[in-house]
Amino acid sequence: MTTTTNQTTTSGNAVKWYISGPISGYEIEERRKAFEKVEQLVKRVHGTNDVFNPIKNGLPEDAAYSDHMMRDLEALVESDIVIVMAGWQHSRGCLNELKFARRLNLQIIGENEVVNDELDKYITSHPLKPYLS
Protein backbone atom coordinates (compact mmCIF):
# COMPACT_ATOMS: atom_id res chain seq x y z
CA MET A 1 0.00 0.00 0.00
CA THR A 2 1.06 3.53 -0.62
CA THR A 3 1.45 5.71 2.43
CA THR A 4 0.83 9.38 2.87
CA THR A 5 2.73 11.85 5.03
CA ASN A 6 0.17 11.76 7.85
CA GLN A 7 0.92 8.07 8.53
CA THR A 8 -2.21 6.66 6.96
CA THR A 9 -2.47 4.48 3.91
CA THR A 10 -4.18 5.79 0.80
CA SER A 11 -7.24 3.84 1.94
CA GLY A 12 -7.27 5.83 5.20
CA ASN A 13 -6.02 3.07 7.53
CA ALA A 14 -3.20 3.62 10.01
CA VAL A 15 0.22 2.58 8.71
CA LYS A 16 1.45 -0.70 10.20
CA TRP A 17 5.18 -1.07 10.75
CA TYR A 18 7.19 -4.30 10.87
CA ILE A 19 10.71 -4.50 12.32
CA SER A 20 13.06 -6.90 10.52
CA GLY A 21 16.36 -7.63 12.21
CA PRO A 22 18.67 -10.53 12.97
CA ILE A 23 17.88 -12.52 16.11
CA SER A 24 19.37 -16.01 15.79
CA GLY A 25 23.00 -16.29 16.82
CA TYR A 26 22.84 -13.30 19.18
CA GLU A 27 22.28 -12.98 22.91
CA ILE A 28 18.51 -12.62 23.27
CA GLU A 29 18.78 -9.75 25.78
CA GLU A 30 21.00 -7.77 23.41
CA ARG A 31 18.49 -8.33 20.61
CA ARG A 32 15.56 -7.47 22.86
CA LYS A 33 17.18 -4.10 23.66
CA ALA A 34 18.04 -3.41 20.01
CA PHE A 35 14.52 -4.21 18.78
CA GLU A 36 12.97 -2.19 21.61
CA LYS A 37 15.14 0.80 20.66
CA VAL A 38 13.94 0.65 17.04
CA GLU A 39 10.32 0.12 18.12
CA GLN A 40 10.42 3.18 20.40
CA LEU A 41 12.11 5.24 17.68
CA VAL A 42 9.36 4.44 15.16
CA LYS A 43 6.66 5.16 17.74
CA ARG A 44 8.24 8.50 18.69
CA VAL A 45 9.06 9.71 15.19
CA HIS A 46 5.93 8.53 13.43
CA GLY A 47 3.45 8.88 16.29
CA THR A 48 2.14 5.34 16.06
CA ASN A 49 1.72 2.35 18.33
CA ASP A 50 1.16 -0.01 15.41
CA VAL A 51 4.64 -1.55 15.29
CA PHE A 52 5.22 -5.31 15.11
CA ASN A 53 8.30 -6.33 17.05
CA PRO A 54 9.19 -10.00 16.35
CA ILE A 55 10.82 -10.33 19.78
CA LYS A 56 7.31 -9.76 21.18
CA ASN A 57 5.46 -12.07 18.77
CA GLY A 58 3.62 -13.86 21.57
CA LEU A 59 5.45 -17.18 21.23
CA PRO A 60 7.74 -18.63 23.89
CA GLU A 61 11.42 -17.95 23.23
CA ASP A 62 12.08 -21.70 22.95
CA ALA A 63 9.40 -22.25 20.28
CA ALA A 64 10.67 -23.74 17.03
CA TYR A 65 12.35 -21.36 14.57
CA SER A 66 9.74 -22.29 11.96
CA ASP A 67 6.92 -21.35 14.35
CA HIS A 68 8.52 -17.95 14.97
CA MET A 69 8.96 -17.36 11.24
CA MET A 70 5.35 -18.33 10.47
CA ARG A 71 4.05 -15.97 13.17
CA ASP A 72 6.29 -13.18 11.94
CA LEU A 73 5.32 -13.66 8.28
CA GLU A 74 1.64 -13.56 9.28
CA ALA A 75 2.31 -10.13 10.82
CA LEU A 76 4.31 -9.06 7.78
CA VAL A 77 1.31 -9.67 5.52
CA GLU A 78 -0.64 -7.15 7.62
CA SER A 79 2.11 -4.51 7.47
CA ASP A 80 2.70 -1.51 5.22
CA ILE A 81 6.32 -0.58 5.97
CA VAL A 82 9.27 -2.76 6.92
CA ILE A 83 12.10 -1.16 8.83
CA VAL A 84 15.34 -3.10 8.46
CA MET A 85 17.93 -3.26 11.22
CA ALA A 86 21.69 -3.49 10.72
CA GLY A 87 23.00 -6.98 9.98
CA TRP A 88 19.99 -8.03 7.88
CA GLN A 89 22.20 -9.25 5.04
CA HIS A 90 23.67 -11.98 7.28
CA SER A 91 20.33 -13.25 8.60
CA ARG A 92 18.37 -16.01 6.88
CA GLY A 93 15.20 -14.84 8.63
CA CYS A 94 15.64 -11.21 7.54
CA LEU A 95 16.38 -12.21 3.97
CA ASN A 96 13.21 -14.32 3.86
CA GLU A 97 11.16 -11.49 5.38
CA LEU A 98 12.54 -8.99 2.89
CA LYS A 99 11.94 -11.26 -0.11
CA PHE A 100 8.37 -11.74 1.08
CA ALA A 101 7.96 -7.99 1.69
CA ARG A 102 9.12 -7.28 -1.87
CA ARG A 103 6.55 -9.73 -3.24
CA LEU A 104 3.90 -7.88 -1.23
CA ASN A 105 5.17 -4.53 -2.59
CA LEU A 106 5.75 -3.20 0.91
CA GLN A 107 7.86 -0.13 1.49
CA ILE A 108 11.25 -1.15 2.91
CA ILE A 109 13.44 1.36 4.74
CA GLY A 110 16.59 1.16 6.84
CA GLU A 111 16.61 2.18 10.49
CA ASN A 112 18.92 5.08 9.59
CA GLU A 113 16.13 6.58 7.48
CA VAL A 114 13.95 6.80 10.60
CA VAL A 115 16.82 8.49 12.44
CA ASN A 116 17.04 10.98 9.57
CA ASP A 117 13.29 11.61 9.87
CA GLU A 118 13.73 12.30 13.58
CA LEU A 119 16.62 14.65 12.88
CA ASP A 120 14.57 16.50 10.24
CA LYS A 121 11.72 16.97 12.72
CA TYR A 122 14.13 18.23 15.37
CA ILE A 123 15.82 20.69 13.01
CA THR A 124 12.44 21.98 11.83
CA SER A 125 11.19 22.50 15.37
CA HIS A 126 14.50 23.90 16.69
CA PRO A 127 15.81 26.38 14.11
CA LEU A 128 19.39 27.50 14.41
CA LYS A 129 19.86 30.77 16.21
CA PRO A 130 22.55 33.19 15.15
CA TYR A 131 25.67 32.94 17.24
CA LEU A 132 26.22 36.10 19.22
CA SER A 133 29.63 36.77 20.73
Question: Language-model segments: which ranges?
Answer:
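Conserved catalytic or regulatory cores that recognize and/or transform ribose-phosphate-containing ligands
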Residues: 1-133
